[in-house]
């Protein structure tokens, strides 16, 4: 297993996952860096925040599938992958990403970002967190908190968005870590961005292993 836990690694996420042993991770977060709806709709004016996203290392669909296959391998049985997707991928479907894995979609949380984005018709104000579980599928003993709603309203501070345009809601992440892991468990984030998951793990007494590779 890769030994550098609780640090901000800058290696390739696949390299990190490949260094981990089978069934060694208690929880994984994954925010694939795809342009998704931006590429599909060809927006002419993306704005400063979306320009920031465009300089991040982008992942092809085949790369995302490879990540998820590795995540399936390293997750312990009945443990969870928290998979971030946008509206485009929610509508188009991501089920093929899970083919050839032991993973199944078991739930969905909508994140209301409390700030309007782009859109030719409706303006985009939400992202979606697919809750994916490794077989065998079961809720009892794997999900401790039962006050988590399927809609989360949480705004990211503007100064954080300028530095990390793909930042995710820390309070929601912290609640999910608390619900799905125990003290001392190992949480993985192979595309860690601002490393907010690391911050949550430190506050909750969990161990973290993750990396963020940005374009030069």
Annotate each predicted stretch with a short phrase.
Residues 34, 38-46, 96-216:
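Class I S-adenosyl-L-methionine
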Residues 1-30, 203:
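SAM-dependent nucleic-acid methyltransferase catalytic core
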Residues 17-18, 72, 174-178:
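Generic structural signal for well-ordered alpha-helical scaffold segments
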Residues 57-114:
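Conserved Class I SAM-dependent methyltransferase catalytic core
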Residues 21-79, 204:
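SAM-dependent methyltransferase catalytic-core segment centered on the flexible catalytic loop
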Residues 8-11, 54-65, 163-171:
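Conserved phosphate-coordination/catalytic loops
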Residues 15, 88-90, 216:
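Short alpha-helical
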Residues 17, 38, 91:
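Glycine/Thr-rich phosphate-binding loops of Rossmann-like dinucleotide-binding domains
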């Amino acid at each position: 297993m890769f030994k550098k836990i609780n640090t901000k690694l800058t290696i390739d996420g696949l390299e990190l996952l490949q260094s981990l042993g089978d069934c060694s991770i208690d929880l994984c977060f994954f925010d694939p860096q795809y342009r998704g709806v931006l590429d599909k709709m060809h927006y002419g004016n993306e704005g400063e925040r979306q320009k920031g996203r465009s300089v991040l290392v982008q992942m092809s669909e085949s790369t995302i599938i490879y990540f998820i296959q590795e995540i399936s391998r390293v997750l312990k049985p009945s443990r969870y992958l928290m998979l971030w997707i946008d509206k485009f991928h929610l509508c188009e479907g991501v089920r093929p990403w899970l083919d050839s894995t032991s993973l199944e979609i078991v739930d969905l949380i909508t994140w209301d970002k409390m700030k309007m984005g782009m859109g030719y018709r409706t303006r985009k104000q939400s992202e979606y967190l697919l809750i994916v579980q490794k077989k065998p599928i079961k809720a009892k003993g794997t999900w401790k908190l039962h006050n988590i709603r399927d809609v989360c309203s949480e705004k990211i501070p503007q100064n954080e968005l300028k530095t990390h345009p793909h930042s995710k809601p820390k309070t929601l992440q912290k609640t999910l870590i608390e619900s799905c892991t125990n003290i001392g468990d190992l949480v993985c984030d192979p595309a860690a961005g601002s490393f907010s998951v690391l911050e949550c793990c430190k506050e909750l007494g969990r161990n973290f292993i993750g990396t963020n590779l940005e374009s030069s």
